[in-house]
Amino acid sequence: MSHKTPNSLVGMLKSGRLDIIGAVGGLLAALLMLPLQLLASQVYIQTLPLVLGVASILYLLASRTDSASTIATLTPQAARLLPSLSVVGMAALVGLATFQGGRTLLYYDIAAMTGMMVMAQVFFTDDGEFSPALILTQVVLLGLVVRFTALMTSPGYIGIDVWTHMSNWTAAIYQTQSLQPIADMKYFASPLYHLLVAGAALLFDIGIREALFLSLAIAMPISVLFVYSTTKLLVGVRWAVFASTAYALIGHVVEWGIHLIPTSLGLVFFLAILYSLTRVLHLDYKLRDFVLVVFFSVAVILTHQISAFIMLVFTGAGLLAQFALSFGLFNPRMSSALDFSPQDTVNLSGLIAFDLGLITFMWSLTPYQGGTFLATIFSYLENTISSSAGFLALAGPDGSTGSAAAGPQHGTTLMQEVVKYLDVAGFLLLLLFTIVGSMYILRRENASHATFTGVVATVAMLVFVFGFPLFGIRTFVPGRWFAFLAAPMAVIAALGVAFLVKNLTPRTAVVLLLLFTVAFPTVTALASHGTLDSPPLADTQTRYSYTDAELAATGTIADIQPDNEEAPLHTDHPYQTVFDRREGQPVKAMTVTNGTASTANETIVHRTYQQKGAAYVRDTAGFAYQPSVSQQQACSGTRDVTYSNGDVTMCTTVGSDGGS
């Protein structure tokens, strides 16, 4: 073990080290943020101060020593055995999903253990036995297994938006071999997703569902290699493997691998931009490298509007980082500002101008809700700021979809509280290491254009994810940002982990890595975002896939129920979205008060899941909550059953427009 020389915290502060100032400032900020917990119960308000405080303390502890240390590693026999065991675990996952007809709690337990074995190889394999290719192969295979066992055991599709994109738009494009069916939709100007799936279906002569799985579903787990390639430019190979492994396991990333919509394809292109732009910023790049950045930028713009805006924020962070470094804002006492050639500045400024110009042009021509997409978004933003924005304006009956916070009169159960923290734990663990990595980069000799771009991009994206929603501004759809944000976070986190392992005492480093190895795969495997098809905690986490009987009922009910906007169907969320997006049937959220459907003349569609699962309904104030509603409660009063297939029942009031 190498000798460690303690450094004085006061001395480092007096020397003007920006990283130490940042760590102390982070600790103070965490303390100042604690009173917010008394004002709001939102999960991130409750947890972010703790994460920031712990990260700051870890960095200060590690900064007190200068020389490297070595940690305990696996024996050669164990290092060679773990890859085989992880492959056995993946085979068990396939077998379980096949024989049990879906992903169960046992499945998720084995998935978590498999993730632990992969992560243990990253952290504890000796340099002589460490094989990046072998571990990355396991990461990609595990990603494929997790995603395809979900997709192949779920009838139809998983999620909400996918029903519109596939059942309506892609199907119509496939049949007509033209974009005319979406000429009045916003995706007419961003059709790459629909063209990819329709083109794959035509090329391979298969259905559009199979084409979606064979194209985008395969690309999603493979795209994590962009994170590895990006991180390898900045830090050692071991920590690059860590970045890709952690990113692949995050529930938000798994979500877009099973809920396959334009966001998914936009994420693939964003990861390609992350790698290609980092390469341009970090190396003596050639013209082809910059052309790749432009190519993937155009691809994102032609795929998805939100993804394009996120890409614009990321590239803008690169320009902002360049200005900050060129003006010597880090620590002018230690050295001169970093030098940038005029070509670097012109190229990055030109890229921003090109992306912004193309986005503005495309959005100005994109039809959306009777106007253009650009004008509509600005109108939404202006309306939000003028009417509902305010500090801690976090929730309301119309603030989001069916997963909105329950009203105050309903409260939350213990399991709902557990799930609330379980869903964010994986992201917060990664954020902890990201904060450490950001502080490490703030030290002048560790800063480069590429690494500082990652820090600036992460901070900017966190503002859109947490900052604006804190004031009630949700126009930028913050829920879509997490998988994109996790990519630069994973890169910066890799630098943070490498720093901690090098500078903490071996015992402390091993304890920290062991805790992460056990906790991170467990919480990410059980998180709601990555288990939309079959949640492990079925009575608390909402299922966003459907049984054969539930899907059959939507078609039959659409055939027998007249399309009447004045007398829509009423059912739970998310089941209502299938009627709307797949069948074009007028539908509203079911209102339930005191255990019964509240309005006597509503046509109710009840499914068994409303009693046994975690479906959302509304109360009379418009808040979403998850009561257990039996068929007798839903079809109470004067309603008669007009359709039933054993799992789904439709009941209407005698004399109403309600089928036959």
Spans of features found by a protein language model:
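Membrane-interface helix-loop-helix junctions at transmembrane boundaries of multi-pass membrane enzymes
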Residues: D284, R333-V346, Y421-G426, L432-M461, ...
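Hydrophobic/aromatic-rich transmembrane helices and adjacent perimembrane loops
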Residues: Y108-A112, F309, I473-K502
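Extracytoplasmic
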Residues: A68, F269, G479, L495, ...
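Internal/C-terminal transmembrane anchor helices
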Residues: A133-V139, L348-F361, T505-S528
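Start-transfer (signal-anchor) and selected internal transmembrane alpha helices
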Residues: S2-L28, Y44-Q46, Y59-T149, L351-I352
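Active-site lumenal/periplasmic loops and adjacent helix-entry segments of GT-C-fold
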Residues: G128-V268, G479-F484
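Membrane-interface transmembrane helices that cradle and orient dolichyl/undecaprenyl
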Residues: L271-R288
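Transmembrane catalytic cores of multi-pass membrane glycosyltransferases
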Residues: L39-S41, G159-D161, I258-G266, L287-V291, ...
